[in-house]
């Protein structure tokens, strides 16, 4: 019991977390020794669901989770071309895909798009917040809805990441 309370009282240490090897400035992760291994033959097709908007000037943590997934798996030996990711964005988070001076996510999104990560906006949320397709960061896709996007992704072999 004492041991458990000591563990609970400890603050997490993020010293082992670092970005890279794919995204040098974001997507920090830590190596894990002795865990279930990943193999160079593993393949991933994963959809991330993001509805929470970032604080002004900050990176969207949901978007960065997708970058973390790529960084940690490539660092563990999975080839980058074995990883297909889509970030389905709805709710206020669609505003993090509109370019602008105060958008702390824009540079990250643009770099992730260059690496083949898809960003898919819920058209229903975009309509609610007055965001048109031509107002989005170049390369971001607009679908009828987030529900539609997830259904279509699942039909092509994507799983949904619950984190």
What are these model-derived regions, one by one?
Residues 52-62, 80, 101-102, 143:
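Solvent-exposed, acidic/flexible segments
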Residues 39-55, 89-90:
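Acidic/histidine-rich, surface-exposed loop or edge segments in extracytoplasmic proteins
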Residues 18, 23-25, 34-38, 75:
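Acidic, glycine/proline-rich low-complexity segments that act as flexible tails and inter-domain linkers
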Residues 4-6:
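N-terminal signal peptide c-region/cleavage motif recognized by signal peptidases
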Residues 59-78:
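Histidine-anchored nucleotide/phosphate-binding helix
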Residues 42-46, 81-85, 115:
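Envelope-exposed proteins and targeting segments
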Residues 80-97:
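Acidic helix-start/capping segments at beta-turn-to-alpha-helix junctions
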Residues 10-27, 98-163:
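A cross-taxonomic marker for long C-terminal extensions/tails that follow the last structured domain
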């Amino acid at each position: 019991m004492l041991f458990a309370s000591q563990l609970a009282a400890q603050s997490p240490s993020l010293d082992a977390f670092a970005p890279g090897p794919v995204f040098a400035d974001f997507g920090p992760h830590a190596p894990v020794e002795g865990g279930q291994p990943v193999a160079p033959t593993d393949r991933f097709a994963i959809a991330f669901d993001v509805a929470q908007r970032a604080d002004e000037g900050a990176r969207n943590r949901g978007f960065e989770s997708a970058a973390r997934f790529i960084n940690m798996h490539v660092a563990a030996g999975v080839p980058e071309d074995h990883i297909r990711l889509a970030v389905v964005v709805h709710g206020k988070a669609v505003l993090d895909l509109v370019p602008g001076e105060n958008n702390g996510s824009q540079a990250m999104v643009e770099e992730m798009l260059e690496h083949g990560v898809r960003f898919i906006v819920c058209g229903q949320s975009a309509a609610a917040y007055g965001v048109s397709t031509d107002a989005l960061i170049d390369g971001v896709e607009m679908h009828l809805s987030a529900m539609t996007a997830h259904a279509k992704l699942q039909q092509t072999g994507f799983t949904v990441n619950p984190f």
